[in-house]
């Protein structure tokens, strides 16, 4: 790739589509992905943040509009779809969550729909929004799938982890939660260091696996679309991109469902009284 960022080879094309639109928090200037080194702690992927916020607001506005205009008569298509999603999530929470909190069902609904919407950005033509961003707004780079950004998925997983700690302390108390970490699986004071290591690893592995699983699947899916577009001539891309897009619909739905299910299960485990 040239210094100006001009795309000349398939390798440049693939690398260009893997660059984020980044903001340097120290200078509040956009980072040029073609002339700088690796991202630092002080860089913010504002494209991922922007699309995740926009999709979250879209979810809230649509569901609020449907709730405000819902009727007891024959529902429209949008109301029917929303009711099916709510019913599906509610049944999942009833089956998997055994606590008493009334927050879990709305949380599960938010997680499922939000992650699903972010995943669905992967079905857009790979060059559509980046082309608009570059030629209309002059952006040096743009990625549109928030869940293909590990900082987004781990941030969501961190939120779940905080809720796990909150419900564990709420249901068991500080002493009970501490005892759970230090006296399991070996109930003897001499094994407290071993128990703390084992339980600490088990506790930390939940948000890590939750975030990395979603990121890994969505990053791989996005990369396959980029490879198809970057390595094949335009007239033959549809032969692979269309079947992969159809199969990818299953993947993005399944990943949203898995993220929701694991969130419910982890919070159910945290809400159990011992």
Swiss-Prot record:
According to the UniProt entry, its GO molecular function terms are: proton-transporting ATP synthase activity, rotational mechanism
Report the locations given in the UniProt record: Cell inner membrane
Q: Biological process GO annotation list?
A: proton motive force-driven plasma membrane ATP synthesis
User: Can you tell me which residues the record assigns to a coiled coil?
Assistant: none
The principal localisation class reads: membrane
Q: Which UniProt keywords apply?
A: ATP synthesis, Cell inner membrane, Cell membrane, CF(0), Hydrogen ion transport, Ion transport, Membrane, Transmembrane, Transmembrane helix, Transport
Q: How does it sit in the membrane?
A: Multi-pass membrane protein
Its job:
Key component of the proton channel; it plays a direct role in the translocation of protons across the membrane.
What is annotated about its quaternary structure and interactions? F-type ATPases have 2 components, CF(1) - the catalytic core - and CF(0) - the membrane proton channel. CF(1) has five subunits: alpha(3), beta(3), gamma(1), delta(1), epsilon(1). CF(0) has three main subunits: a(1), b(2) and c(9-12). The alpha and beta chains form an alternating ring which encloses part of the gamma chain. CF(1) is attached to CF(0) by a central stalk formed by the gamma and epsilon chains, while a peripheral stalk is formed by the delta and b chains.
| Family the UniProt entry places it in | Belongs to the ATPase A chain family.
- What protein am I looking at? ATP synthase subunit a
Say which species the protein is native to: Yersinia pestis bv. Antiqua (strain Angola)
